Amino acid sequence: MFEMRYVYLFAICIKFVSSSELGKINNLLQGRLIYTDNSVATNVLESKFPFLKSTCVKDALKLFLPQCIANGLESIDAETRVETAIKLSICEFQASGLGEIPENCMVDDLGSMMDCMFELESSSQWWTTYSGNYQRLSSICYENLLPFEKEQILKLFLNITELYDSFGDDVDTKLNHLMFQMEQDSQNFLDDLARMFRNYDNELRNATESNRIILENDLSFFRNKVNDVLYETSEQLEVQIIEKNSQLMNEVDTVHHIMSDLADELAKNDIKSKINDLKDDSLNNLQDLVEMSNDVKEYYSRNNKLVNTELENFSMGLKKQLGGMSKDLSESQMEAIELLQGFNSILHDSLLPSMTDEIVPEMTNFKNTLLQEWTAITSTLNGDFALWNEEIFSTFNDISEKLNGTKKKLDDIEIRVSLVHKNVMTMMRVLDFMWKTSKMIIRCGYLAVKNKYYWLLCSVVWIWSKYRTSRVNVKMIPIKRYYQWAALLLSIYLGAKTGSLIDF
């Protein structure tokens, strides 16, 4: 990450110092090689480089020496030679302490120089000095070649140093402007990114709130519907149980009356007809009970199917809504990821190649200096980028936590729906168990009524309860009672053997 930012900054800086800037720098360098500019302190340079000190001989050779070294002595015109020889002669006169110097030779003018020559001819000493200097111009040219080259090299170095100084100032200005522009662009990008995430968060909140309201309404409607169905079922079951209980009590009373009548008939010896009538009535009543039990069973089966259908429809609807919400959430996450990937691809595929292609070979020599100057800048940028990364990561973590909270709420709703379904199924199993128990009791009663031994046992119990006495003395029972008991036992035995008395 650090290397990518470093290359990115280096490419941006190099972009601003590209072809047009290099052309300006080349022109400026050529101009400084031709036209000298003493921008460095003269005293310091003359103390470090004595050959730079201004002397009379140096001033005299100022025009002659560059042309002679560059193009040779033959390229110099006669006027320049004469002027140079005159100036060298004047320098010798001044160095020797000669008091009388021609006045026309002290003026730097072509007409004065001609007058100066006429005056030099007037004195043999002056003319000899002038003639010797004129003849030594070729040797003077080669004798001053090395000092002249040193001076030119030093001037070139000073020009390059000044060029580097101005280039550094330009680079600092460009970097400051670039940093300011980058900060503005980064701030605008962060503002746009924060605005985008706020809009995304608001949309996600609104969608979650609307889905939560829809789910709550559906759950409330289903709960009310289930409560209504259960309430109606419980009321109908209670009414039917009360009816069955009353019918059972009536049947018990009827059986009790029948048993009383049977006892009376037994006393009157009219048993067979009463038993047959009782049998027919009991069969009819049991058939009615069986039909009613079948009706109740069909009613509960219909209610059970209705409740199961409602639960299945609600479960399917809830699964579809949860699937739609999960799909929307996944699509939103994919859009955010595609946006970040698009920004990353734009950065790596468009910006970096276009900037790195403009790096010119001439800037390679400046890389080490720029690296040292940019170390402090990169450290500051690293802190800023780290802070931006932390803010972006914290925003993503908040969004992930909110999504996890929404998922937990949906899981809680699903658990509650499963608990409601479980409670309804438990209630249905309890009702089914009650129905099976009541059916078994009715079946046992029906089988008991049909069994001849049950009637025999009831008859014995009834007779025993009717004729029992505390501590009966056998001797006190009359003989008539023995005959009656014997007749009763004989009839019971014969009925059990032949099946003619109690038969279906």
From Swiss-Prot:
Entry keyword set: Endoplasmic reticulum, Glycoprotein, Karyogamy, Membrane, Nucleus, Signal, Transmembrane, Transmembrane helix
Principal localisation: endoplasmic reticulum
Signal peptide: 1-19
Topology relative to the membrane: Multi-pass membrane protein
Compartments where located: Endoplasmic reticulum membrane; Nucleus membrane
Entry GO terms, CC: endoplasmic reticulum membrane; mitochondrion; nuclear membrane
GO biological process, one term: karyogamy involved in conjugation with cellular fusion
All ranges on the Cytoplasmic side of the membrane: 471-481
Ranges per topology, Lumenal: 20-452, 503-504
Sugar-bearing residue positions: N159, N206, N313, N404
Induction: By mating pheromone. Expression is directly controlled by STE12 as cells respond to mating pheromone.
Regions crossing the membrane: 453-470, 482-502
Pfam families: Tht1
Subunit structure: Interacts with PRM3.
Record function comment: Required for nuclear membrane fusion during karyogamy.
Family indicated by similarity: Belongs to the KAR5 family.
Record-given protein name: Nuclear fusion protein KAR5
Gene: KAR5
